């Protein structure tokens, strides 16, 4: 979990993940952590450069970047193309419409989701144009670009994956020719909707938190670090800073957290959580280590969880 570790630790973990044979790495792109206790939130694009240089085979994805508020899409187009080149084509740009937590920080308005989707659509189209390697001038409803060319290219356009929650975002993924979708719930209707729109089952992404600890009691304490994800995205997208997430989650019962976040030494809750996504049709599942012991969490995955899964094309990461 990126908000629990420094940039240098994330790069170290990326090399360990590659050595263990994991398939991809995911990094969140935040300026704030979710909760005050998290303490870290390194600049994703600096870390990505380090990860691209330190690894050679493992795929890399942002989970996710919002290219429309604190960033301009021209800047993300250049950043993504650079990481794609540095990683020899191993990079995928995961995109979303943003959360107020991160996107209000430059003083811009954080509008309703329909307008955010319209801005994201324009940004994605603009980035796709820039990856052609031509000089681009764009005068849009939300963004302008003046005679700009991205010189650093990987040879092919950067594949894009879109965070989705329903028909509107699925339509956006289709209309912007995304390579895949990403979701936080094991919702088979999202996968079915993606396939109906011409998408590939291989381009479906999700994540599962792992609050592994040697005892159930310690695991529940660690699971509290992930309580920000229990309130639902309608709430999470609107809160402006970590203190608000602390206030919104302070009265959650241990039972609520324990039911939502797999924790402790018993592999069964982790197996159920991951199998739920696999059964819904998701192919790429990110492991989010919520505890401090990365190596022990990965050992637990390899020895206790993975052997019990009914896998087809499921893959894993250390987010």
For the regions a language model picked out, list residue spans one by one.
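Active-site-adjacent structural elements that line small-molecule/cofactor binding pockets in enzymes
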Residues: 1-319
């Amino acid at each position: 979990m990126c908000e629990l570790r420094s940039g240098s630790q994330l790069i170290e973990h990326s090399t360990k993940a590659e050595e263990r044979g994991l398939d991809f790495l995911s990094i969140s792109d935040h300026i704030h952590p979710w909760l005050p206790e998290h303490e870290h939130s390194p600049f994703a694009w600096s870390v990505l450069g380090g990860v691209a240089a330190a690894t050679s085979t493992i795929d890399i994805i942002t989970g996710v970047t919002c290219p429309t508020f604190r960033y301009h899409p021209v800047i993300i187009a250049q950043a993504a193309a650079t990481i794609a080149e540095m990683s020899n084509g191993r990079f995928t740009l995961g995109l979303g419409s943003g959360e107020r937590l991160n996107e209000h920080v430059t003083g811009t308005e954080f509008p309703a989701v329909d307008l955010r989707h319209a801005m994201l659509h324009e940004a994605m189209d603009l980035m796709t144009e820039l990856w052609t390697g031509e000089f681009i001038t764009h005068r849009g409803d939300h963004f302008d670009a003046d005679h700009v060319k991205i010189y650093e290219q990987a040879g092919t356009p950067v594949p894009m994956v879109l965070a989705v929650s329903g028909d509107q975002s699925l339509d956006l993924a289709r209309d912007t020719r995304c390579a895949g979708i990403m979701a936080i719930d094991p919702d088979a209707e999202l996968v079915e909707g993606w396939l109906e729109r011409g998408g590939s089952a291989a381009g479906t992404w999700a994540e599962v938190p792992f609050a592994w600890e040697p005892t159930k009691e310690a695991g529940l304490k660690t699971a509290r670090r992930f309580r920000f994800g229990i309130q639902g995205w309608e709430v999470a997208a609107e809160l402006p800073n970590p203190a608000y997430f602390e206030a919104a989650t302070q009265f959650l019962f241990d039972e609520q957290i324990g039911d939502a976040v797999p924790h402790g030494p018993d592999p069964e809750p982790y197996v159920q959580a991951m199998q739920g996504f696999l059964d819904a049709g998701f192919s790429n599942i990110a492991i989010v280590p919520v505890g401090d012991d990365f190596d022990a969490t990965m050992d637990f995955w390899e020895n206790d969880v993975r052997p019990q899964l009914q896998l087809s094309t499921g893959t894993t990461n250390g987010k």
